[in-house]
Amino acid sequence: MRYCHIISFLALFGLQSGQVCGQWLNYPAKGQPRTRDGKVDLKARAPRTRDGKPDLSGVWRVESTSIEEWRRILGDRFEAADRIRVPGMGIGEVSKYGFNLFMDYKPGDEPALRPEAQALLRERRSSGDLRLTSEDCKPTGFPMAILLAPVFKFVQAPGITIMLLEEGNVYRQIYTDGRPLPTDPQPSWFGYSTGKWEGDTLVVETIGFNDKAWLDGAFHPRSEALRMTERYRRRDFGHIDAEMTFDDPKMYSKPFSIKVTHLLQADSDILENVCAENEKDRSHMKGVDRGLDLR
C-alpha cells in the first residue's frame, strides 16, 4: 500500500488551517475531580448519570498516532510529511485512521472495493471532482470529521445523546429512548442513529447515510447502504475507548473496524466555526491530484 496521499492531504489542510484547533482554553469547570496541583484528574472514576449509566458528556479529541508509528507507516516519506507545519494538524497530532481507515491492513488483506466503488472513484477523479466535501463548505464525512484534528462534544441527556462537532458546527443525534431504526430513512450526511446500553458501553447503530461524503482522507467512498456500529466506553474520567465497524456491501467486499481512544479536553469547549465566512480556498482546489491509490 502506498501512502503518498498522506503528505498531500496534510498539505491540503494547510489551506484550511484557520478551521482547526479552535477552543476556549483554561476555563476551570466546577465539579471536576482535580489533583493537588489543580489539574483535572484524568484517571479519576468515570462519572455517571442519575440512572447509573456512564456519562459520556464532555469535550473530546481523538488520541494522536505516535511519531514512532508514523515513522513505521511512512518509512522514508516521514521527513517530508513532518516538514508540513499546520496548526493542530502536524503528523504527530492526528490519528492515522483519519487519513486511511485501512491503515492497519497488510497489502491485499484490506476489504476490496466493489466495481461500483472503483467506477465512482475513477469518475470523480477524471472530472476533477475528487476532493473533500469540506472544500465546498459541506459537512466533512463521518468518521473523518472526528478522526482528524477537530474536537467534538458529547451532551448526554435522558433519551438522547448529542454529538456536537466543531468542524462545520454540525451535530449528530443518537436516540436512546428505545425507538427502532426507521425502515426507509431520508439519506443524510450523518445518518439516523439509535443507541442502547450494554453494561457500561453505549452501542450506536446508524443507517440512512447519503453517498456524498468520504469515510477518510484516502477518499474511501460510502453508499446509502452503509451501516455503522459504534461502541463507546468511558473507562475513566479522561478516556473513552471507541470501536467503529463499517458494513457497506455496495462499496466493500467485507465489513471492517477500527479502535481509537478519545481524550478529554479538560476545562475547554468547542468554538463557532462558519466555513462560508471569508472562504477563499475553493477556487484553487478543483482538479488537485492527491496521489490516491485506487488499488
Task: Label every PLM stretch briefly.
Residues Q19-R295:
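PEST-like low-complexity, intrinsically disordered acidic/proline/serine-rich tracts
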Residues M1-H5:
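Positively charged n-region of N-terminal signal peptides that target proteins for export
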Residues I7-Q16:
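Bacterial N-terminal signal peptides
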